[in-house]
Amino acid sequence: MAVKIRLKRMGAKKSPFYRIVVADARSPRDGRQIETVGTYNPLTQPATVNIDEEKALKWLADGAKPSDTVRNLFSEQGIMEKFHNQKFSK
C-alpha cells in the first residue's frame, strides 16, 4: 500500500484550514485517512503550523512520501533535516 502524507482540506468556503494526514495514495483528497499528524492554517499571519514531530518522523521512517506542500512545511519546521540525519547516520 502506497502511503502519502498530505493536506486534507477542512473549514468553510473561502476560509480553508488543513489537516496534515497520512492516507493511502489512492484515496480521495478529503477521504479516508490513516492518522492525523498535524494542522495548517494559512489564513493567520504568519501561517499557523502544528505538527506532531514524533508521528511525522515515524511515518517518514516507515516509507510514507510527503506531498510537495507538506515537504515544504516539514522543512520549515526542521523535520526533514532530522529525518535525513536519522536515516543516513546508521
Swiss-Prot record:
Keyword Ribonucleoprotein set for record: yes
One Pfam family matching this protein: Ribosomal_S16
Gene Ontology terms, MF aspect: structural constituent of ribosome
GO CC field: cytoplasm; small ribosomal subunit
BP GO terms, sorted: translation
PROSITE patterns the record matches: RIBOSOMAL_S16 (PS00732)
Keyword hit for Ribonucleoprotein: yes
Keywords: Ribonucleoprotein, Ribosomal protein
Disulfide bonds: none
Classification via PANTHER family: 30S RIBOSOMAL PROTEIN S16, SMALL RIBOSOMAL SUBUNIT PROTEIN BS16M
Sequence similarity: Belongs to the bacterial ribosomal protein bS16 family.
This protein's name: Small ribosomal subunit protein bS16
Organism: Lysinibacillus sphaericus (strain C3-41)
